[in-house]
C-alpha cells in the first residue's frame, strides 16, 4: 500500500491543487524539440547565405538581443504604427521585435487579472458570509478571472488555460472552485532565432523563432498558498529560405496568425511546506502542443480596456447589485425578526411579571408553578403535566390545547418559558437529544422518510431523497448528513467508487441540568441575546447567549476506491482505503463574535416564532472526523487537506436555525 502511495500523484497532491496538474509536463529529454541554444544557432554568414537574407542579419540579431524586450517591441510599433501597415510584410528582425512584446503583454494581462480579482473581493465584502472558504461560492461570486479574461480574448488569444494555451485538461477545469493569482513575475525572458542542420542535407539549416517565458506565480488555490513556477517554451515552424519564411510569416491566414509549438516545464511546485516539483515532472506526461495564435490581440493590440469592460459588465456590476440586495434583505429580515422577537419577549416578560405578582398574593398559583418546574425535568413528566394535571389551567393552558400537536406544544412552551426560561430551554434540548438518538438508530434513511410522525414534525415530503433526509436535521443522518463541500462530494462521486454504512455505535450526551453546580449548569441569558450588546448575566458567561454542551458520536464503515483513470487529477482522494470514520458533532453556546469583523454571521438565537409556531435556535457547532484502521497515512492527509478533521460552522447557510419544537414534538409523539 505504501508503494501505491508513492506511485499515485493523487495521494501526494491535495484536491485543492488538482487544477495545477494540467499545467505540468516532464523534463525528459526530447531531441526533436529543444529550445535551448544549440551549436547550430546562427554564428556566421554561411547559414544566412543559405537563407538569402543577407549577411547583416547575424549582427542585427546580436544587436537586438542586447536591447530590452520593451525597446525591441517599441521598434516594431514604430515601423508598424497600425495593423493596416502589416501589408508591407515582415522581415526576420520584425518577427523578432514583435515576439519581444510578449513579455509586457503577459505581465499587463496578469496585472489586470489581479486588479479584477480585487474588484470581486471588494464586491463580496459588501455582504460577506463566507468565513474561511466554508462553502463553494457560485461562479458569479468567485470567477476564475484568469480563465474568464482569456476566454474574452477570443480565438487565438494567449495566454489561456485551454487547448490553445497552457492546455489545461477539461476535466481539471471542472475542479476550479477557487483560483486566484496573488503575484507574478517574468524573469530571463528570451527570444532567439534557432538553427538546426537538416538530417538528410547536412549543408542545409532549418530555422525557427524560439520564445522562452519563465513565469513565477504565487497562487491561492482553494484558500491554500501555492508557489508555481513554470517555463513556457514556444517555437514557430521551421523555415530555410526567404520563400519559406514568407510562407510562414507573410502569407498566412491573418497578418499575424502564426502557428507555434509549446511545451510547459515545472520549475517549482510548492504548497503546504511540500515540494512536489520532481514528482510533478516525473509522473505527468510531456505536453507538446500545436497552437494557432493571433499575435495582434495577444501582443500588438492587447485590448485590456475591452476585456475589463466586459468583465465589469458581466461579473462586477451584477455582483455589486446582488450583494447590496442581499445586504438589504438580510438587514430587513434581521430587523423584522428582532422586532417580532422583542415584541414577543415583552409579552412573555409581562406574563411572567403578572404571574410573579400574583404568586405573591395567590398561594394557588405558587403550587402550579412548583409542579411545572418539576415537570420540566423530563419529557414524560412534561407531557403528563400538560395533558392530565389540572394545575396547568391555572397557568393559562386550556383543556382544548393538545401537547401532542404543534400548536398545543408551542402554547405549552410559551407558558413554561413565561415562568421558567432556563427550564424551558432544558426541555427543548432534551427533545433535540431524544429525537437525534432515535433517528440515528434507524437502519436506513428510508425508514426516516417513511416515518409519518417524523414527516409531520419536520415537514418532510413522502418523496424526499436521501440528501433531503440528511439535511433536515442537525446533526444529519448518514453520509448525506456529514458536512462536505458540494465540490468535494461531487469529486468523490466522479473520481471514485465509495460506500458508507448506516450509522453505528451511536452515543448522545447532554450532561448537566438547570440546577446543577456551576461547572455543569445548563443556562440561558435572562434576556434575548443581542450580539455586541447583550452578553448574558455576569463575566463568567461573557460571549455566551446560553450554556450547554450536546455531543453526538457515530461510527461509519467506509470504503473508497479511486477509478484508475483519475490518477493524475483526483487530488488527495485516496487510491484505496477501507476503515472506520468516527464522526463527532459538538454543540454549545460559545460565540466568539470578535472573530468576524464585518462578515455577516448568524447570531445566537432562541426565539419564539408565533406565526409559524417554532422555537428558532442557533447553536455553535463543530464537526470532527477521525479515521480508524490501517493505512491512516492515506486517509488522514485527505481529511486534513479538506478540513474534515475539524470543521467549525459559522456560515449562515450552515447555521440555519433549528426548530426545537419539531424535535420535541417528534420525541413526544413517538413515546409509548
UniProtKB/Swiss-Prot annotation:
Query: Which organism encodes this protein?
Result: Mycoplasma pneumoniae (strain ATCC 29342 / M129 / Subtype 1)
The protein, known as:
Uncharacterized protein MPN_042
Record InterPro entries: DUF237, DUF240
Superkingdom, taxonomy of origin? Bacteria
UniProt lists the family membership as follows: Belongs to the MG032/MG096/MG288 family.
Q: What is the lineage of its organism?
A: Bacteria, Bacillati, Mycoplasmatota, Mycoplasmoidales, Mycoplasmoidaceae
What Pfam families has UniProt attached to this entry? DUF237, DUF240
